[in-house]
Amino acid sequence: MALLCAGCATSPHISPALDAQLAAGRPARITGADGALSAHRTQAILSKLGQGAAKTYLLKRHIAVEEAATRTPLVAGNKVTLLENGLATYAAMFKAIRGAKHNIDFNIYIFTNDETGQKFADLLIKKQTEGVQVNLMYDSVGCLDTPRTFFDRMKKAGINVVEFNPVNPAYAHGDWTINQRDHRKVLIVDGATVFVGGVNVSGVYASGPMKQLLHKLGRKSEKPSPREKKIKWRDTDVEIKGPAAAEFQKLFMRMWNSQHGKPLIGRYFPHLKPQGHDLVHAIGSSPNTPINLMYLTLISAIAHAQQYVYLTNAYFAPTPQTIEALEDAARRGVDVEVVLPSITDVPVVLYAGQSHYEDLLESGVRIFERKKALLHAKTAVIDGVWSTIGSTNLDWRSILYNYEINAVVLSTTFGDEMEQMFEQDRAHSVEITRAKWKQRPMGRRMEQWLSGMWESLL
C-alpha cells in the first residue's frame, strides 16, 4: 500500500501504479469448501465464467487486483439470492432466524424501537430463550433515537449486546473515535447463512405490503403515517449460503473483538458444503486502513470495464477519483449509467452529488433520478459478471470514516438479475439530460455549489 498517496485522510486517491503492481505475477486464486483450489481448477472456473472478450478481460485483470488488495479469498460454491426490497429481506431474515440452531450474529447500523424493531427484538429474544446464542452489535450514532431500555430488554434475556463506539465517552471501549461509525449491516445465522446489503431494522421499509407481512407474523399493524403513504424506501440485500459465509463470520468476529465483546465460544465455523455455483468475495473496509478496500476494488472494476457500468447509490458525494473513473470509462465507449435518489433524508448530500452532474454528463455518463421512492440501495453490476451489494455509499464518509461491508459476486446468472433490477429502477426514474440540467434555477445551483464545497466533511 506504499503507493497510495500521502494525505489520504483528506483526499483519497489510488495511484495508477498500484493496479499494475498488485496484479503483477498474482494470478487469481479461488478457495472452495475444502480449501484452496488448484491453479488448473481455478482457471477452468474463470474461463467458463468469462466467456466473451469483455468478461475475460475484466476477470483476468481486475480479479487479481481485487484479491491482492484485500488479501482475502474469492470463494466458490455459493448460492446467492437477490433480495430486491425490505419486504423480501425481512421475510428471508425472519425465516432464517426462526430456523437457527446454534447462534445468530447481527451487526446493524440502525435498530429502531418501532413496530419493525420490536418484531425483530421479540424474535431474537425467543431464539435466545430456546438456547440459540444471539450476539448483537449496533452503532451508537445510528441508534441515537433508540432508548437504551430497548437493548436492555434483550440483554436481560441473555443476548450479548455491544454498542459500537458509544457517543458517551464514559461507555467507550478504548480510544473515543466519535467520527468512526459502524455502518455495516450483516446478519449471520449458524455460521452458514449470511444477509448483507443496505437494509437496516426500521419501519421506513414497513409501508404497504410490509405492514401486512408484520401483521401475519404476529404483530398488529399500526396505521401508516402520511409520510409512509407517500414515500417508500427502496433498498437491496442478498442472502448467501455456502463456504463464503465463513469469511463474513471472520469479519463479524473482528468487529466484535475490537469492541471487547464477550468471547464467542461455540459452533461459529461449521464445515460448509457447496450450495451453488456463485463466486463470492467478502470485503470489509475500515477507516484504520490506508484506503477503503471496497473503494479500491470498485475503482479498479470500473477501470477494467469493457461493456457497461451500472451503479445504484443512495448517498452520492463522489471523490475526484470516482468521478475520473466514471468519466474515463464513458469516454472509452463503456455504457456508464447511474441511478441516484431524487428525494432523500440527507438533502445536503443529494445537493453535493448534483454539483458534479454537469461534468459527468459532458463526459457521456448517463444519470437517472429515482422517483416515488427514497433510494437507499448501494449496488453495482459491471459487464454482466461482476456485481456488488453492501453498505458502502459513494461518498467521503463511507470511504474515510465508516466501517463498511460488501459482497462481491462473480456470476453471469446473478449479473443478469442485477441488470434486470437496475433496468426496473431506471424505468421508475427520470433521466437528467444536459439540456434539462442547464435549466435548473439559480437558487438550486447555489445549494449544490455550497454543498459540494463541504462534501468531504459530510
Question: Where do the protein language model's features map onto the residues?
Answer:
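Charged, low-complexity intrinsically disordered terminal segments
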Residues: 8-458
